[in-house]
Amino acid sequence: MDTAQILETIKMISEENLDIRTITMGISLLDCIDSDSDKACQKIYDKITTKAKDLVKVGNQIATEYGIPVINKRVSVTPISLIAAASKDKDYVKYAKALDKAAQTLGIDFIGGYSALVQKGYQNGDRTLIKSLPQALAETNLVCASVNVGSTRSGINMDAVKEMGQVVKSASELDFMTNAKMVIFCNAVEDNPFMAGGFHGVGEPDAVINVGVSGPGVVKSALEKVKGASMDVVAETIKQTAFKVTRMGQLVGSIAAEKLNVPFGIVDLSLAPTPAVGDSVAQILEEIGLEQVGTHGTTAALAMLNDAVKKGGIMACSHVGGLSGAFIPVSEDAGMIDAVNAGSLNIEKLEAMTVVCSVGLDMIAIPGDTPAETISAMIADEAAIGMINNKTTAVRVVPVPGKDVGETVEFGGLLGHAPIMAVNKVSSADMINRGGLIPAPVHSFKN
């Protein structure tokens, strides 16, 4: 191999924040179903702690052996609403606590899958799980939750959209940080290694390793070398850089799967920012030529970035999946925070950006007095974008009690901090209160 390429890879890791964001083991809990919830919870704990017992050790070994930082080790499980439905319990918080206990025993960072799939309607387990979300998330530390409220093939379940607005509001009143651990999806994927939205789909193997990479700093650094060049050159540069980043993800995923004796699933091609300086998706867009993210041209630059990352990634790895795009979480991206504070980026522009990237309105802090119906309407808008464009979209908004526009909230760690953003004060309540199902779009009929 060319020495220059080896040195380039070393520089990517040491100076440009290239890392493996997560090695996530997906574990099926279908064989843990039991009408006795205590037995089910014990089976869940036993299976997770057996299957993933070496996950942290292997992640640390790979980081040491290959010099590639592995930031998070995580587990995702079969949606708990499916597992707990057999129990007839009126409350599923004990299942969340079983997941939390397993995660703490393993020493992992997060466990995802306290989830329900209600895109076309509820079964009883879904209703029970959704009602328990605020309490379950407030009483656990490492559990992440998600609810899928729509899909291109099914339409949007507006009853669920209405309820999730109320859940977000209730959760914020218990502890606003719980909303950082909950995502509301349209077109949720079954092999997502990222949190808080990861769960293990029923079509997946008994256990599988999925990997998420992170390389905004690497892409920005590459673009600094082609200042003033045409957009063709910019796209090609991003594509070649994404190839290298994804190749590393595949290497780590394959090694981890082999050491853990489970199949290798996918590499998620998402560019995931962190609050660290130089690890920002917004700064890539500014390197392309925007004075500040949020101005006119932002959506076009982001569309090109997202597409070029995918093109480079699918050449590098034959198994790609998850969310695969550019994440634009406000609190986790220094450039996004600066743009919001400067007034050049607002929620409406972020919504436009979600049309061309993954995943949606992510880690956005909003005033604590925002009505539940307004939150539901934000969810409905994002779900509509996902449904019509046949892509995954999501909402992870955090109403912060007692705070208003212009103030800041601190989340800590990888979640960073966020300015409170303005939401439209005009009511959407009458529309949300209609309920029902928004039918699937005409182009969903593929058969």
UniProtKB/Swiss-Prot annotation:
A matching Pfam family: DUF711
Transmembrane stretches, start-end: none
InterPro entries (alphabetical): UPF0210
Superkingdom of this protein's organism: Bacteria
PANTHER family in the cross-refs: UPF0210 PROTEIN MJ1665 (PTHR37560:SF1), UPF0210 PROTEIN SPR0218 (PTHR37560)
Subunit description: Homodimer.
Family: Belongs to the UPF0210 family.
HAMAP family: UPF0210
This protein's name: UPF0210 protein LSL_0162
Record organism: Ligilactobacillus salivarius (strain UCC118) (Lactobacillus salivarius)
Lineage per the UniProt record: Bacteria, Bacillati, Bacillota, Bacilli, Lactobacillales
